[in-house]
Amino acid sequence: MLLELAHALDKQLLSLEKIPDSKPDLSLQLIFFDGEEALLHWSLHDSLYGSRHLDPKMASTPHPPGAKDTNQLHSMDLLVLLDLIGAPNPTFPNFFPKSARWFNRLEAIEQELHKLGLLKDHSLERCYFQNHSYGGVIQDDHIPFLRRGVPVLYLIPSPFPEVFHTMDDNEENLDETTIDNLNKILQAFMLEYLHL
């Protein structure tokens, strides 16, 4: 989905280079985390290897280059984490009150694309983005960044897909229609967010 997002936004992002003296306030960075799962037993030290490595690296890298009081984490306007996306009929709760405005935009974009007939096999009675809060904490790659104050929009279905962590957690159980619909919603969200 991230590669599809980058491909879909490529022309709009490249068009900014053609505008003289154009310095966009926002840019898009795609980060692929690896090593989320524990090797032995889930703990603070045996999990989230990729994000726990990147977080302090970004915190110690001045941004803009040469800055004394700001680092790459300060430049992160929003971390959008996508996880376990691809099973049919997912529902996404809003995990953090501070991300409600962005979650509400996803909810509104989904409804607008539905009204325009651009979402396949989609029902407003079963929307993907349902604005109810989640009552617990899920340990995932957003945690190191959240602890440092980076705003997070966490998109993981609740409940988790039935095939999660089973031998059936494979390509055969990805739902093409759901993925296509979510790609459209996320692309519209990113175009709006980046003012493109």
Label the predicted regions:
Residues 78, 84-196:
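Active-site-adjacent substrate-binding region
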